[in-house]
C-alpha cells in the first residue's frame, strides 16, 4: 500500500513576502516532521491574496508591485526547503510578468527540482485579479516521491469552477490535482470538487485560507476519486464516500493520505473518466463566439 501524505497549510497570511517566506518555511518544517510528502499552500501565499479595490488604479499599481520573480529569494527559499526536508512543496505567489503579473504555483520535488509551474488561467477579472494576466496552458508533471512517481497537475481557485480545467488535466494523465484556493468555500463548491474528482477519476487536494483572512473560511479538502468499491463478487458494487477531509474554519496544518495503489486500480477498472468520451461531438465547447460578456466586468474598465 502506497500512502501519499499531503499537508494542507491552512494558514493566516502575512503582510508581505518576507514574513510569508519565514512563516511558510516554518510550516513546511512542521509538515515534514509529521511525515508529509507534499506541502500545499493556499492561493497567492506571497501576498496573502491581498484584496484591493479594483476600481482604484493606484491601489492596483501597488498590488502589482508586490509581485515576485520565480527566481526570487521568496521562491528559492521554498526550493531550498523542499531539498532540505526531502518533501515536495507547492508554493504560490503573485508572479512578475508582462504586461501584468500572474497568479502562479510552482511545485518543487523532494530533491529541490522544479517539476511543475502553472499560472491561473481563469482569473477573476470581476475583482482584484483584473490586475493579473491569465496563464495560457494546463500541464501535468511526474513528481518523484518516496512512494514512487505520481502524475500531478494544478488548478487554482476559480479554475475549479470550470469542468474543462479538471478534464484537461485528466486527459493529460493527472492522478492528483493540487488546488490552492482563496475564497469562502461552501457546500456547493465542496460538491463541485467531489464531482470533478468523480467524473475524471483524479484525486484532489485543496488548501484554503482560514477565517482569519477576509476571503477565507477554512474548509480545505481532500477528495478521493473512488466513488464505488470495485468488488468482483458484487456486480452492483458499493457506494463509497469520496470526501476524505473537510477542515474547520481556523488556522492550522491538516493532513490527508491517498492510497495510490487503490486509486490506480480504480482508474484502470471504473467506467468513468475519459475512456468513453465522444469528442467529435464537443465542438461547441471551444467556440469562443458563444461566450457572453459579463456586463459588470471591471476588466473592461482597466
Predicted regions and their residues:
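A short C-terminal boundary segment appended to hydrolase-like catalytic domains
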Residues: 253-302
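Extreme N-terminal starter segment of soluble prokaryotic enzymes
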Residues: 1-7
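A short, polar/charged loop-to-alpha-helix boundary motif
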Residues: 120-133, 251-266
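Short beta-strand-to-turn element immediately C-terminal to the catalytic PLP-Schiff-base lysine
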Residues: 108-109, 143, 223-225, 256
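Active-site catalytic loop in hydrolytic enzyme cores
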Residues: 80, 96-175, 180-181, 185-195, ...
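CN hydrolase (nitrilase-like) catalytic-core segments centered on the catalytic cysteine
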Residues: 67-89, 160-255
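Cys-nucleophile CN-hydrolase/nitrilase-fold catalytic domain and related Cys-dependent amidase chemistry
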Residues: 17-18, 22, 26-111, 115-117, ...
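Short polar catalytic/cofactor-binding loops
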Residues: 10-17
